[in-house]
Curated annotation (Swiss-Prot):
Enzyme class: ligase
InterPro entries attached to this UniProt entry: Asn/Gln-tRNA_amidoTrfase_suB/E, Asn/Gln-tRNA_Trfase_suB/E_cat, Asn/Gln_amidotransferase, Asn/Gln_tRNA_amidoTrase-B-like, GatB, GatB_Yqey_C_2, Gln-tRNA_amidoTrfase_suB_CS, Gln_synth/guanido_kin_cat_dom
HAMAP family: GatB (MF_00121)
Role, per record: Allows the formation of correctly charged Asn-tRNA(Asn) or Gln-tRNA(Gln) through the transamidation of misacylated Asp-tRNA(Asn) or Glu-tRNA(Gln) in organisms which lack either or both of asparaginyl-tRNA or glutaminyl-tRNA synthetases. The reaction takes place in the presence of glutamine and ATP through an activated phospho-Asp-tRNA(Asn) or phospho-Glu-tRNA(Gln).
The protein's assembly and partners: Heterotrimer of A, B and C subunits.
Protein's name in the database: Aspartyl/glutamyl-tRNA(Asn/Gln) amidotransferase subunit B
Organism name: Thermus thermophilus (strain ATCC 27634 / DSM 579 / HB8)
Family the entry assigns: Belongs to the GatB/GatE family. GatB subfamily.
């Protein structure tokens, strides 16, 4: 029996106005090529870097949220390698004194250990086409945080879930959009395969995976590939692999570098950055409620375990729910049900995100409250949702259209008698124990009330009138 051992290196683009070591704008996505550059990020002679305080603070927020140990000073190093989109021929990164060591992230019933977090600058972007390579250096020098896990992950599904959890965490902290589509969350995976109980196998790295699906597919293929090699009695070679989306296969890029190949040495143009303990405590106090804390609170409010998990790790839904709950207009579980089913379904159908609509927490809470109190039927409530999504007041809609549930038993009994008289065969079938025939009678009454009666009440009154049950 073989098992996989997986570790991740996650690169997160930090949400700052300017780059890591210069004043160029950091919002490179969609900009004209090579318009967000200066002598510092182009590596021109004599240009000196200056650390971005906001980027450092963002890194501290993540380190503290994960429970990592933060040193009293940060030291930056030069990581030397040659590639066309790295204009300085070195990357300013961190080596032996990173931003954080240790810590962990909850994943189900266990925790994935964090090895280290460090700050660094991003490289530019190469575009290969028609025998040429074009360079866009807008991204060069953008602030990144790299998070490295211990090899605690066992399956491709766990790796994908870990990345989704990290994305939710940094979005909750407000330090990164972490959008894979915009290149703001990228992952390298390290994977080896071994027989259960044996020492770790030879590690293979798969580089530059830019979607959760790609991470899962690349790992699935690579685990199969390594397992087949071991079953043939051969040895896996240490290498750096790429992933081809179309075929779903990994392919060798180059022999994997060792640490010494990068010739790390302290960045001579940057003195150590002190991290005073009072600054660290100030950052700690500013941390918001973290997703796993939010999940525990939702469960304490009576929200089902799986629903609480999905809501807590979907920041837009969590923010919405947290504004709706204090209003006291609907129960927590009912709000959760509507958000995860009806609202999510309508958003998917329209290709919208929640924040792109005019749906307010109060509007949804009022609509759900109308249904919970029995003032409108489920069918009516769901029919009003598209208009409430556009900012309409559900209570006003119900008033104006006369959509309130018909709860007057006297009026309903008259309609029940009419239905029985109009459908004598169905009524007789119910009397003879064929309860399924009751549905036709219920439907007749519901049509008379334009769907505004409670089906359970109509059923009870019909059974009473027919002398059944």
């Amino acid at each position: 029996m073989y098992e996989a051992v997986i570790g991740l290196e996650v690169h997160l683009h930090l949400k700052t106005r300017t780059k890591m070591f210069c004043g160029c704008r950091a919002d490179y996505f969609g900009a004209e090529p090579n318009t967000h550059t200066c002598p510092v990020c182009l590596g021109l002679p004599g240009a000196l870097p200056v650390p971005n305080r906001v980027a450092v603070e963002h890194g501290l927020r993540l380190a503290l949220a994960l429970g990592a140990e933060v040193p009293e000073r940060l030291v930056f190093h030069r990581k030397n390698y040659f590639y066309p989109d790295l204009p300085k021929n070195y990357q300013i990164s961190q080596y032996d004194l990173p931003l954080g060591r240790g810590g962990s992230l909850p994943l189900g019933e266990r925790r994935v250990r964090i090895k280290r977090l460090h700050l660094e600058e991003d490289a530019g972007k190469s575009l290969h086409l028609e025998g040429r390579t074009l360079l866009d250096l807008n991204r060069a020098g953008s602030p990144l945080i790299e998070l490295v896990t211990e090899p605690d992950l066992k399956t491709p599904e766990e790796a994908r879930l870990f990345l989704q959890r990290i994305q939710a965490l940094v979005q909750t902290l407000g330090i990164s959009d972490a959008s894979p589509e915009e290149g703001k969350l990228r992952a390298d995976v390290n994977v080896s395969v071994r027989r259960v109980g044996e020492p770790l196998g030879t590690k293979v790295e798969i580089k530059n995976l830019n979607s959760f699906k790609s991470v899962q597919r690349a790992l699935e293929y690579e685990i199969r590939r390594q397992t087949e090699i071991l079953r043939r009695g051969e040895k896996v070679k240490q290498a750096t692999m790429g992933f081809e989306e179309g075929s779903g296969k990994t392919y060798p890029m180059r022999t994997k570098e060792e640490e010494a190949d990068y010739r790390y040495f302290p960045e001579p143009d940057l003195p150590p950055v002190a991290i005073p303990r009072d600054w660290l405590e100030e950052v700690r106090r500013s941390l918001p409620e973290l997703p796993w804390e939010k999940e525990a609170r939702y469960r304490a409010l009576g929200i089902k375990e799986k629903d609480a998990e999905v809501l807590a790790y979907t920041p837009s839904l969590a923010r919405f729910l947290d504004q709706a709950l204090p209003l006291g207009l609907a129960s927590p579980q009912a709000l959760a049900n509507w958000l995860l089913a009806d609202v999510a379904g309508l958003l998917h159908e329209r290709g919208l995100r929640l924040e792109e609509t005019r749906l307010s927490p109060e509007g949804l809470a009022r609509l759900v409250g109308l249904f919970e109190r029995g003032e409108v039927t489920s069918r009516v409530a769901k029919s009003l949702l598209p208009e409430v999504l556009e900012g309409q007041d559900p209570e006003a809609l119900v008033r104006e259209r006369g959509l309130k549930v018909v709860a007057d038993e006297g009026a309903l009994k008259a309609l029940v008698a009419e239905a029985i008289a109009a459908m004598p065969e169905a009524a007789e079938s119910v009397r003879q124990g064929k309860v399924k025939a009751l549905d036709a009678l219920v439907g007749q009454v519901m049509r008379k009330t334009r769907g505004q009666a409670r089906p359970d009440l109509v059923r009870r009154l019909l059974l009473e009138a027919l002398g059944v049950g």
